[in-house]
UniProtKB/Swiss-Prot annotation:
InterPro entries tied to this protein: Znf_C2H2_sf, Znf_C2H2_type
Zinc finger (C2H2-type) residue numbers: 68-92, 98-120, 127-149, 156-178, 191-213, 219-242
Keyword Transcription listed: yes
Organism of derivation: Homo sapiens (Human)
Family named by the database record: Belongs to the krueppel C2H2-type zinc-finger protein family.
Predominant subcellular localization, coarse grouping: nucleus
Keyword terms of this UniProt record: Activator, DNA-binding, Metal-binding, Nucleus, Repeat, Transcription, Transcription regulation, Zinc, Zinc-finger
Gene designation per UniProt: PLAGL2
Name of this chain's protein: Zinc finger protein PLAGL2
One of the record's GO cellular component terms: nucleus
Cited SMART domains: ZnF_C2H2
Length: 496
């Protein structure tokens, strides 16, 4: 038959661990309800525990041995487990969510409320002192009160076991043994004060006592100018001296501070919504993005720009090429604007500086069939200003969708789609985009062609049309050095 141990036997424990930690396993005293269960007992305080896991945190007296410390600035408390740290963190919160249903007292922790509810227990008998008339809810408080009366008369004997003591303090400590609490060594004053000879039971009592030496009074009464060094002294002062003010606070209605804070939050969200998401047609047509937020709100060094009524340049062109704009925006004439503070990059869109590919695609659709070729001469227009105005209207009338389609048609590259074909052909040279066409020239043909193009505007100054683009500059050596007569674009190489 196999025997299973419910706890660790005492003979398995390491003697070295007992010396370092200060605890050992001792069997429970035999009695009427003798059991084989082994319990742990602290050698220092004599506190019994059901297992070693509960005794181990108890045997860590120094704060540096407790791994979980409170992150608050002036707290300095450390704990042996995460649970005790989280339970302690509730005391630093300004909110007290646990309220007593009988006296409206608030508590940070639920166990504190549970201990407080024992004072309102109707099943508990009220212990009445016949000498002074005080009532007590606990037997320990009642016995301690009777011991104080007996000590004042000179009797230092326990009324339960008739044991005599030398001082009143020793008698009060002995009374805890009759209230099912650990007496004697468990309540030894082992925490001394660094400034005087007094000793205390816990480190909390030492910190509370330090107010006597430092003179700090951090607790201010909200009804008067009086300050206190301890919070319990402030609470006692408020209940004693300002009881009428406390009653007025309880009877006052709820203020509207929460509603005002909610409305301010909504207003901020409404200010930011046109910038963070796509606005409607009315907002796009009537309001400009530079004037959405008040510029002086976040810094006085930023100059405020007047609202011009033109949408931001990045709004229309941040969409991918080939996608149509979801909103139908009508062209709006804008007055003369100041130069921008920051220079726009290559991704910005300016109507007066269009790429050459867009100009060629627009010229192909203009009424009158304007052409850039000097091989087909046309009669010169007597009014070049009218033609320039006609070109400006055509540029403004073009929608962003057509602009993106023209850009896509001239810059499509199929090399990443046809890269799997086993073609051992010479590499493609950088194409020269002229009017949306991709052409390749040999090295022998490139130089005479450039010379011809440069001489054309000088030979026929008035026969090329109303537009004059000036002499063409020669290509840099990066683009002309590697040209070949047999080179074709990649799209045609794939289908040779």
């Amino acid at each position: 038959m196999t025997t299973f141990f419910t706890s660790v036997p005492p003979w398995i424990q390491d003697a070295k661990q007992e010396e370092e930690v200060g605890w050992k396993l001792v069997p429970r005293p035999r009695g009427r309800e003798a059991e084989s269960q082994v319990k742990c007992q602290c050698e220092i305080s004599g506190t019994p525990f059901s297992n070693g896991e509960k005794l181990r945190p108890h045997s860590l007296p120094q704060p540096e041995q407790r791994p979980y410390s409170c992150p608050q600035l002036h707290c300095g408390k450390a704990f042996a487990s995460k649970y005790k740290l989280y339970r302690h963190m509730a005391t630093h919160s300004a909110q007290k969510p646990h309220q007593c249903m009988y006296c409206d007292k608030m508590f940070h922790r639920k166990d504190h409320l549970r201990n407080h509810l024992q004072t309102h227990d109707p099943n508990k008998e009220a212990l009445h002192c016949s000498e002074c008339g005080k009532n007590y809810n606990t037997k320990l408080g009642y016995r301690r009160h009777l011991a104080m009366h007996a000590a004042s008369s000179g009797d230092l004997s326990c009324k339960v076991c008739l044991q005599t003591f030398e001082s009143t303090q020793a008698l009060l400590e002995h009374l805890k043994a009759h209230s099912r609490r650990v007496a004697g060594g468990a309540k030894e004053k082992k925490h001394p004060c660094d400034h005087c000879d007094r000793r205390f039971y816990t480190r909390k009592d030492v910190r509370r006592h330090l107010v006597v030496h430092t003179g700090r009074k951090d607790f201010l009464c909200q009804y008067c100018a009086q300050r206190f060094g301890r919070k319990d002294h402030l609470t006692r002062h408020v209940k004693k001296s300002h009881s009428q003010e406390l009653l007025k606070i309880k009877t006052e209605p709820v203020d509207m501070l929460g509603l005002l804070s909610c409305s301010s939050t909504v207003s901020v969200k409404e200010e930011l919504s046109p910038v963070l998401c796509m606005a409607s047609r009315d907002v796009m047509g009537t309001k400009a993005f530079p004037g959405m937020l008040p510029m002086g709100m976040y810094g006085a060094h930023i100059p405020t720009m007047p609202s011009t009524g033109v949408p931001h340049s990045l709004v229309h062109n941040t969409l991918p090429m080939g996608m149509s704009y979801p909103l139908e925006s009508s062209p709006i004439s804008s007055p003369a604007q100041l130069p921008p503070k920051y220079q726009l990059g290559s991704t910005s869109y300016l109507p007066d500086k269009l790429p050459k590919v867009e100009v060629d695609s627009f010229l192909a659709e203009l009424p009158g069939s304007l052409s850039l070729s000097s091989a087909e001469p046309q009669p010169a227009s007597p009014q070049p200003a009218a033609a320039a105005a006609l070109l400006d209207e055509a540029l403004l009338a073009k929608s962003p969708a057509n602009l993106s389609e023209a850009l896509c048609a001239a810059n499509v590259d199929f090399s990443h789609l046809l890269g799997f074909l086993p073609l051992n052909l010479p590499p493609c040279n950088p194409p020269g985009a002229t009017g949306g066409l991709v052409m390749g020239y040999s090295q022998a043909e490139a130089q005479p062609l450039l010379t011809t193009l440069q001489a054309q505007p000088q030979d026929s100054p008035g026969a090329g049309g109303p537009l004059n683009f000036g002499p063409l500059h020669s290509l840099p050596p990066v683009f002309t050095s590697g040209l070949s007569s047999t080179t074709l674009p990649r799209f045609h190489q794939a289908f040779q």
